């Protein structure tokens, strides 16, 4: 597959697309977009490969051989005049952050934040240290059973608690633990024990420029989750949550989108997760009238985008449905 470049056209490659074929549709629905959208995955049965894209590529698994993966990805980009690579899964984002200069030497922009930001987002302990430093609330957290037991005896924390990996994605191994016996059975190195906050959970898309300036913020109240991903949500406007989100965007200084999870309990807003990418809750943001992908392309084209934080539809219920696809494999 060889692609000729059109004047004033931006060609995008979304990597490890998985089931997120809707991202292609979201880019292409913009009448001003004149470029092409390609996708890739390591699995030729990924549903996102088959849709409205302008071509797809099967690439090696990034976590198995990152050097081979990066080399293959750069070759695909050069052969198809791809201007920007947009990764949407955590392990690949971390890998590609190490090779940004390799891509930039070929004139290709990889949409990933710097290593400092990624270390904060992917390591729950470092995330909490960062939140502590900037004065943002987070659940009480313990990385050993001994420390947790001491806090339990002092009445600082109580069951039930949340058990999750320090490095986690998609709620894998995350569970609610009701007593010490269950905790001792499930806990192992590389996990943390967290206070369970009772309140309203929100997902926020906090979008920054390449200079780390926050220009968009959309808040959604979570209604249902499926496999660690938002399944149903409703767009809301909440000044307490927005204040924390904008402050967080400024202090973290990420680029492009940050998918942030928060819980509001009374007047307190706790940050519980940071994902430096387009997350599973992005469709609600898009359907509410905020096309962050189009904004991203404008930034890639060197255009200025003014901040706007409240220009989206409120009380919009967004639900994911099951659709079916079939293709004949070669």
PLM feature spans:
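Short glycine-enriched loops at secondary-structure junctions
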Residues: 41-45, 90-92, 116, 210-213, ...
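Active-site nucleotide/adenylate-binding loops and adjacent lid/helix of ATP-dependent enzymes
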Residues: 117-200, 210-213, 239
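Short catalytic-loop micro-motif centered on adjacent basic/acidic residues
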Residues: 13-14, 84-87, 139-140, 192-195, ...
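ATP-binding N-terminal substructure of ATP-dependent carboxylate-amine bond-forming enzymes
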Residues: 2-111
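Short, charged, surface-exposed secondary-structure boundary motifs
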Residues: 47-50, 66-71, 113, 119-125, ...
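Phosphate-binding site of ATP-dependent enzymes
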Residues: 173-253, 263-264, 268-270
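ATP-dependent carboxylate activation and anion-phosphoryl transfer catalytic cores
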Residues: 80, 237-330
